[in-house]
């Protein structure tokens, strides 16, 4: 009987820990709507959108018909942050996500990608390319509508 109680207690304890580690993944339509907050108005309709599947892995949520790629908010980070960039930057951005998944820190990711660009392993656009970022606090994020009350824009220009 003691073994059954001990096993039950351990099972409950470990299942509770596992549930805490799993982030909340928003429904696909809400991820897309939130990602579009960063997109220029004239590019929203045809933008490709990456988001997160039920396992928390990056996945294509919507194929695109223009040259804009948008990324839904990461369920692993605090706050809300969505971004869009032109498809010429997609390999550079994918590489950053790969390195992050490997556990690399921001400065190490920058260094590795910089070296890979310098050696030609990672291709960058031949002309300047814009990235649009829309961010804000979780407290003003409406999970049912995909809207962000205190959102602000930030822009990054990648130059060759």
Language model: regions and residue ranges:
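Short, linear, compositionally biased motifs with a strong N-terminal bias
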Residues: 10-11
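C-terminal motif of bacterial Sec signal peptides marking the signal peptidase cleavage site
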Residues: 14-16
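Positively charged n-region of N-terminal signal peptides that target proteins for export
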Residues: 1-4
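Primary mode marks residue(s) on the alpha4-beta5-alpha5 output face of response regulator receiver
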Residues: 21-160
């Amino acid at each position: 009987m003691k073994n059954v109680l001990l096993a039950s207690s351990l099972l409950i304890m470990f299942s509770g820990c596992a549930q805490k580690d799993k982030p909340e993944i928003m429904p696909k339509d809400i991820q897309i709507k939130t990602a579009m907050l960063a997109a220029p108005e004239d590019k929203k309709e045809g933008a490709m959108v990456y988001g997160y599947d039920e396992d928390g892995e990056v996945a294509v949520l919507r194929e695109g018909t223009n040259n804009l790629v948008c990324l839904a908010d990461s369920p692993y980070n605090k706050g809300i942050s969505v971004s869009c960039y032109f498809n010429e930057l997609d390999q550079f951005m994918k590489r950053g996500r790969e390195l992050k998944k490997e556990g690399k820190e921001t400065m190490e990711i920058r260094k590795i990608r910089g070296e890979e660009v310098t050696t030609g392993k990672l291709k960058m656009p031949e002309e300047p390319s814009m990235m649009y970022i829309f961010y804000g606090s979780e407290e003003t994020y409406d999970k049912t509508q995909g809207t962000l009350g205190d959102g602000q824009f930030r822009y990054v220009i990648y130059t060759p």
